[in-house]
Amino acid sequence: MSERASRETWRLKRRVDHIPRMLRDLSPASQSKRLVVLGRSSALQGLVRQIVIWLGFVVGFALVSSLAGNRAHVALANGLRVVEAEKWLLHGLPELVVQRTVASSAVLTFLTVLTYRASEFVVVSAALVWVYLRRRWAFTQFRNTIFAASLVALVCYFVLPTAPPRMFPGLGFVDTVAHAGGPSRDPGVLSLAANEYAAMPSLHAADALIVGVTIALLARRRLVKVVALLWPAWVWLCVMATGNHFALDVVAGSVVAGLSGAAVHAHARAFPSSSADSPASALR
């Protein structure tokens, strides 16, 4: 009997020992920790979903855009029209001055080529991830503005295929990216579906402006704001220095960015429930 009583006492003690743990699990602090874990898990799943959407959009855009790249004679003629327009409006070709200035410095050449190759996909992707993780309430508008600008540009590439400056060596332009080594367009699988006549408007210029303004508005540190505001101007210089866009391409890209941002913002105000994420879900 004493052995049986001892076992019952031990079992009762184990049950009693579990009570503080159960109470701790029911405490506000414990519940808060669980909510944080669930929130982070949900954020990770959401991030993966958004990455898939973004990559799908990029691949789809490249494939559709490539369908507009088979009218070389039209694109070259339109490129010459841009040249004539710049000579009339600007009394010259500012891209030539930019190219020659940058070409005089190996460091500047390296930086402009690196920026051209990375600014369109790498930087935009990084900005999307940062906004999603740190300012998720602004993510939908940011992403949709990128999408809208890309779709407007895509329509322009079909309607108005335009050759970039690098295709006019007779005017003094140089394909800086090709001379630096590697493909003229973005590296990787997407280069197989690249549209060589997608100069007007400059999507590099449009996306740089969208990214720069968005990060400047959302960032808290002054240095980050300043760098973000300078980013578009630097990209604009780089796309001209590498011979990939005329100045008018950059202007057109900036207009596309502005109109896309205004349209997405107007839609968000008209339909707030479908155009914004909850601030409470953002990871600080």
Where are these predicted regions, by residue range?
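N-terminal transmembrane-helix/juxtamembrane module of multi-pass inner/ER membrane proteins
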Residues: S2-V123, L283
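Membrane-interface capping segments at transmembrane-helix boundaries
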Residues: T9, L23, A266-D277
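Alpha-helical transmembrane segments of integral membrane proteins
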Residues: Q45, R49, I53, T140-T145, ...
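Aromatic-anchored segments of alpha-helical transmembrane domains
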Residues: V59-L63, S150-F158, L230-M240
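Membrane-interface loops
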Residues: S65, A72-E84, Y132-V224, F271-R284
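Hydrophobic alpha-helical transmembrane segments
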Residues: L114-V129, H204-G212
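Interfacial helix-loop-helix junctions of multi-pass membrane proteins
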Residues: P164-L171, N195-A199, W234-S260
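Hydrophobic transmembrane alpha-helices
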Residues: G212-L217, A257-H265
